[in-house]
Amino acid sequence: MAITIRRMQGGDADELYRLLSDPVVMRYLELPYDRARTEVFLHRAGLAAQPLVYAAEEGGSFIGYVIYHAYDGNSMEIGWVLLPEYWGRGYASALTDRLICLARQAGKSVVIECAPEQAATVHLAVKKGFRYCGMADGLAVYRLA
């Protein structure tokens, strides 16, 4: 598994739309995106001077994106949204390890926010040593000190 995390590019719009328009992918996130909303997301979150999200690739193929940005003064929020064909194959776990390492190198603790019903994310967070800290804006918050 050779996963690359890189800055988003304008050319990611089609693959990002495929991801964000999929109702299965978006089940616990938001309503599926149309093309225009995907473009706004790409420009505001992925192409910003300080991005909130980054593309994830394996072997040069887009597999989804990761969330990596400041959560508060001491923490980075991490997460991932992957195409369904990459679910259950260890990609989220490997990406989580990479993002934890990046945050640790920056001297930060790590937070994952997710819908409480998102069993796979909750399972992965607990498996990686995150502790449930409560709810914020309808999302369960897990923290790795």
Label each region the model flagged:
Residues D22-P23, A48:
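Acidic-histidine catalytic/liganding microenvironments
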Residues V24-H43:
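Conserved GNAT-fold acetyl-CoA-binding loop/helix
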Residues R27, A36, A49-V53, V110:
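Secondary-structure transition/capping residues
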Residues Y33-R35, R44-G46, V81-L83, L95-T96:
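Short, charged/polar low-complexity linear motifs in solvent-exposed/disordered segments
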